[in-house]
Amino acid sequence: MEIGKKYELNPHRIKSFIDISSSNASMVGIIQENGGWFEVKSISSLDGFDYVTEIICANGEIYNDDGMGDDYFELSEEEFYCFREYKEPTSEEDEVKDKVSGVTKIHCIVDENNVDEIIELLRKTFKK
C-alpha cells in the first residue's frame, strides 16, 4: 500500500481478513459503513514491516491506530493481500464491469414485433 492511494476490500478476501485478527471485523465495518473505500494517509515501519496507521474514508471520516475499540484502525503488511486498489468508476457501465466480471449491459425494448430479433441479439452477444 502507498500513501495517497485508495483501496477497498477484495470481496473474496473479507473472511480471510476477519480470520486474521478479532479487531479486523470492526475495520471491515469501518470501511463498509463509511463509503466502501479509504485513502492511506500514514504508514509506519516496525521491524521491517509496514503498517497503515491512518486512513481517510470515502465520506471523510478519519481512523487511525490511536483509536479505541471500534474506532481502531491499523493494517499490517501481511494483511494487504485482502485489499485491492480502488478505481473510481467513470460511468455506470464501468461500475457494473468492476462489480461483476463478464457482465454485458444491453438496453432494449422488447415487444411481440421484435422478440425474435432480441433473442438473436442475446444469443450473438453471449454465445461467442
Curated annotation (Swiss-Prot):
InterPro entries (alphabetical): FRD2
Name assigned to this protein: Uncharacterized 14.7 kDa protein in frd-Gp32 intergenic region
